[in-house]
From Swiss-Prot:
Mg(2+) binds at residues 39, 61. One of its GO terms (molecular function) is metal ion binding. GO terms for biological process: division septum assembly. InterPro entries: G_ENGB_dom, GTP-bd, GTP-bd_ribosome_bio_YsxC, P-loop_NTPase. Belongs to the TRAFAC class TrmE-Era-EngA-EngB-Septin-like GTPase superfamily. EngB GTPase family. It comes from Staphylococcus haemolyticus (strain JCSC1435). This is Probable GTP-binding protein EngB. Necessary for normal cell division and for the maintenance of normal septation. The keyword Glycosyltransferase does not apply. CDD domains: YihA_EngB. GTP binds at residues 32-39, 59-63, 77-80, 144-147, 176-178.
């Protein structure tokens, strides 16, 4: 899959089903805990610096952000989970919005769950992965921040994450660095398999 970085647009930031765009394109949702590097991942995959806004402030994304990727697919940036400073009522509101999207959206073909390669998956990571599996949602696990781990230890960290998530044999796990950006084509090819 080849992407023209000059043909990428944020279509809408939605908070309810009535606002979801009707594009006829397959959708790939990006999920992960706050500050796992979702925005950096999106920007590096599409070859743009600031398409998805990165933030030092966790819990910043509070909407479903729909990006048209070169009229080939839609990336949907989902609010990060597991950020304690978001109020309980806000968390419940996000949870309902995300659940509605993940379980009812027919154009959703894949969820990319991002986890931090440096750490064990959090309880929220495990809950999210189990949730996706419960609803039979195809999932690609991408371990971010690969550049922060010594090359010789990457496979050990991946194995650990696989075990902690109890990864489904049908799901793929891959490590990635938004800074080094060396596996971009490999990930596009994996995504294309689901569209």
């Amino acid at each position: 899959m080849n992407i023209n970085p000059n043909n990428i647009d944020l279509i809408i930031s939605a908070v309810q089903e009535a606002q979801y765009p009707d594009t006829g394109l397959s959708e790939v949702a990006l999920s992960g805990r706050s500050n796992v590097g979702k925005s950096s991942f999106i920007n590096s995959m599409i070859g743009r610096k600031n398409m998805a806004r990165t933030s030092q402030q966790p819990g910043k994304t509070q909407t479903l952000n729909f990006f048209n990727i070169d009229d080939q697919l839609i990336f949907v940036d989902v609010p990060g989970y597991g950020y304690a400073k978001v109020s309980k009522s806000q968390r419940e509101k996000f949870g309902k919005m995300i659940e509605e999207y993940l379980t009812k959206r027919e154009s959703l073909k894949l969820v990319i769950q991002l986890v931090d390669l440096r750490h064990n998956p959090t309880e929220d990571d495990v809950l999210m992965y189990n949730y996706l599996k419960h609803f039979d949602i195809p999932t690609l696990v991408i371990c971010t921040k690969e550049d922060k781990i010594a090359k010789g230890k990457i496979q050990k960290h991946i194995k650990n994450i696989k075990e902690k998530l109890d990864l489904d044999p049908d799901d793929t796990i891959i490590s990635y660095s938004s800074i080094q950006n060396t596996k971009q084509q490999q990930i596009w090819d994996l995504i294309a398999n689901y569209l």
